[in-house]
């Protein structure tokens, strides 16, 4: 396959500017070509009484990401896989299902315990780049997120569990391992994507 980019050379063009423009136009190829070094994932709760919580939404999100990154994906294959995985459980589980670039599925499970203790969180030091395509998909490519452990050292080892992220517009976005949910007047709200 061949993909061409070009630009209009005018009297005040510089080679550096033209090269930068060509790289910018070709960025779409680079964003999707990263599909070799990571997997997609969804983490969900399974309980004996209710099965997988919000299963349809998890499947739809994985399907959308698989389409974006051109990963082979079958809703039916995932549903069968999750059903077989659930057959091993007798107690609530935290289930992470991973899809690699070959369409292969793998699970990681652990017993689920209701979090009764409070999490200690703090605001991240630096903003995330809301244009980073990996913020819009759940992937194993986690280097886009700051590490709570690194920031914990900055805060004197206070035992920080997670970081509240914000973007370059100073808008709160999410935590590194969870969603931000705010209750106002009895209604629950989450920020839009990144």
Residues of each region from the PLM?
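Helix-start/capping segments and mature chain N-termini
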Residues: 2-5, 10, 14-194
